[in-house]
């Protein structure tokens, strides 16, 4: 299935490109999410007529992502968790926990854009990737400390 991308999508293509994707991915994800249009001649002409609007919207989204990235860089993430004698956590720190941490600070970062590179199951410093936009990716440090009982 060929689609016209309405925004930049990592590993697939940029705004306005006609790319070939799996039919299910196009029908079930890209098109319903408003990220693509089926590549028909009618849709191509509609896209070209509205191309400037799409580009302006993408520039605005990129600017918002860069602003959010600056705020993410300012915050030091410290998570307090109960741990055993060998500094192993009872459970783990997940992307949902990190999203809740940011939400408590007033930053809207959904858990699906937070990539925990390695499972966080011990005390100490860990690296996590936050994909705010295909062009704006930050690697942040998370400090996990023992919770005081």
UniProtKB/Swiss-Prot annotation:
Keywords: Ribonucleoprotein, Ribosomal protein, RNA-binding, rRNA-binding. Gene3D superfamilies: Ribosomal protein L9, C-terminal domain, Ribosomal protein L9, N-terminal domain. The lineage of its organism: Bacteria, Pseudomonadati, Pseudomonadota, Alphaproteobacteria, Magnetococcales. Binds to the 23S rRNA. GO terms for cellular component: ribonucleoprotein complex; ribosome. Belongs to the bacterial ribosomal protein bL9 family. One of its GO terms (biological process) is translation. This is Large ribosomal subunit protein bL9. PROSITE patterns: RIBOSOMAL_L9. One of its GO terms (molecular function) is rRNA binding.
């Amino acid at each position: 299935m060929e689609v016209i991308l309405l925004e930049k999508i990592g590993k697939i293509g940029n705004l306005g490109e006609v790319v070939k994707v799996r039919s299910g991915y196009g029908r079930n994800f890209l098109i319903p999410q408003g990220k693509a249009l089926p590549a028909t001649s009618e849709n191509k002409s509609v896209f070209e007529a509205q191309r400037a609007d799409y580009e302006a919207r993408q520039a605005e989204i990129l600017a918002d992502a860069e602003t959010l990235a600056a705020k993410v860089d300012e915050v030091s993430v410290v998570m307090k968790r109960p741990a055993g004698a060998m500094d192993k956590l009872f459970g783990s720190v997940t992307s949902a926990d990190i999203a809740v941490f940011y939400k408590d600070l007033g930053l809207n970062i959904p858990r699906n854009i937070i990539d925990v590179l390695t499972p966080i199951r011990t005390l100490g410093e860990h690296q996590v990737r936050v994909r705010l936009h295909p062009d704006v990716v930050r690697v942040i440090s998370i400090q996990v400390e023992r919770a005081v009982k």
